[in-house]
């Protein structure tokens, strides 16, 4: 039976489960025996494993996704089927996006681009979707939207599970939110929410409620925003999800800040930080920065400065923190200048004009540009430099208009 394919001793090892044969060896042995369905069954089993792994990744179950990754990697040591390898690489890319391991994702992308011409439409759907997510993680939101839209085109011509449709629409809603395209965000978020509710996916339903709350807040619909956050809060308590509770408390803080209820805003931000004590530095910095701003506008400068210094220390202790979290380095340093008495005025001007404003303009973070241009205008006005003050007040106004007109 094995003549011309493998040695008798190797065949014996296969029969005794001492080695796992390659796909090619299995194919040749099956041909010799006149059996056609063994490879297909193995392929189907592998595809099912990969799709289950992908669903686990999409559900953000990091621990189980890591366990499955190691198990599937061992399986793939002997897999030579082009289709299986393509799906493995695609879902491996999605796994490393979950981990925010951008360096590994970009290395995988090189391999995937080499295989692109062999992809069918389903593979191309995943490819564009994950490429959109990569650009989203890199804060290149226009590029992210472009690739999500390409994925959406492929999605319409194929048959997918409803949860896949909901996930794509949620990602589209997220990127529309980042681009301040509020109607688009509401449309996709509501569609995703309807699917998640029909499938009793509580966590993803809560995420949609949070996103809708952000949209209504931006429209000034405070009561609707509170209703969305309240629904999300109830769900988060039911499923005991501290990560969600941290996000909800943060957004409630932002809402109270909009209403100039500074004490309530600060309490929500503090609760958020308690829930986020085991979260990523990125998640904690978002709330620390909001807390600093709230102390600043409520004129509690001592606590504002204490939080600035604590945040900068966290940055410095983190490996590559100053580059990984450069945006927050800029934010915290701006407030360090504003709150400190012994820093050179020329340093502040140079820092704002050469580093802060260009950075936030480049990444189209118009709210930050408007705020920091106003701070610079106030700085010049206090020093009777009215021409420069007028220039930066106009700049602030223009970027506020950009936010409204997006």
From Swiss-Prot:
GO terms for molecular function: DNA binding. InterPro entries: Cro/C1-type_HTH (IPR001387), Lambda_DNA-bd_dom_sf (IPR010982), TPR-like_helical_dom_sf (IPR011990), TPR_rpt (IPR019734). Keywords: Activator, DNA-binding, Repeat, TPR repeat, Transcription, Transcription regulation. It comes from the Bacteria. Induction: Expressed in the late logarithmic growth phase. TPR repeats lie at residues 125-158, 206-239, 246-279, 285-318. PROSITE patterns: TPR, TPR_REGION. SMART domains: TPR. Activates the transcription of nprS by about five fold. May bind to the upstream region of nprS promoter. This is Transcriptional activator NprA. It comes from Geobacillus stearothermophilus (Bacillus stearothermophilus). The lineage of its organism: Bacteria, Bacillati, Bacillota, Bacilli, Bacillales.
